[in-house]
Amino acid sequence: MITVEADISDLWPEQSNWEALAQTACQQAVSVSASDFLLAKDYETEISVCFSDNDTVHALNKTWRDKDRPTNVLSFPMMEAEELAEIKNRVGSECLLGDIILAFDVAKKEALEKGISLENHVTHLITHGTLHLLGYDHILDNEAEIMEDLERKALAQLDIPDPYSDHETGKEGLDG
């Protein structure tokens, strides 16, 4: 079972149910991954999603990734992929997957540039972030292809169009 703890800044428009969107995006990402066993009621899994601002994400990006700019989404896994695989053998395990932090202005700008709703774009960003928490990455082209395919699959199940239809697979990924 996946529990999402959402912290939502006042910047984020109130007309959207960001907490429900985060819950859905996280569950979909887990459901298409090799860690889909975490959806079973025997597992207590928590993901923290922070709907934040550019300044906060900029500071985190500089501190943890040595990139002096805000980005759309950051993920901070609490465990290595190997540790996550071990949990499968321990029914009744509790697992804090990690934190996902979103920058409102970057996400809004990207959604406008792509001509898509902020909600669809944020669903994609949270899906992407959740896959990072599950050990997926896009450093190498083959990794990027696997991760993007999982994102497409999760989003298609939510009737969200392919977010990568306008580019080639690349190492930089969403959170570049």
From Swiss-Prot:
E.C. designation(s): 3.1.-.-
Keyword vocabulary terms for this entry: Cytoplasm, Endonuclease, Hydrolase, Metal-binding, Nuclease, Ribosome biogenesis, rRNA processing, Zinc
Classification via Gene3D superfamilies: Metalloproteases ('zincins'), catalytic domain (3.40.390.30)
Keyword match Hydrolase: yes
GO molecular function terms noted in the UniProt entry: metalloendopeptidase activity; RNA endonuclease activity; zinc ion binding
Annotated InterPro entries: MetalPrtase_cat_dom_sf_prd, YbeY, YbeY_CS
Cell compartment(s), UniProt: Cytoplasm
GO cellular component: cytoplasm
Cofactors named for this entry: Zn(2+)
Record carries keyword Endoplasmic reticulum: no
GO aspect biological process, one term: rRNA processing
Comment on bound cofactor: Binds 1 zinc ion.
Binding site for Zn(2+): 128, 132, 138
Pfam families reported in the protein's UniProt record: YbeY
Function: Single strand-specific metallo-endoribonuclease involved in late-stage 70S ribosome quality control and in maturation of the 3' terminus of the 16S rRNA.
Family designation: Belongs to the endoribonuclease YbeY family.
Protein name, entry field: Endoribonuclease YbeY
Chain's gene name: ybeY
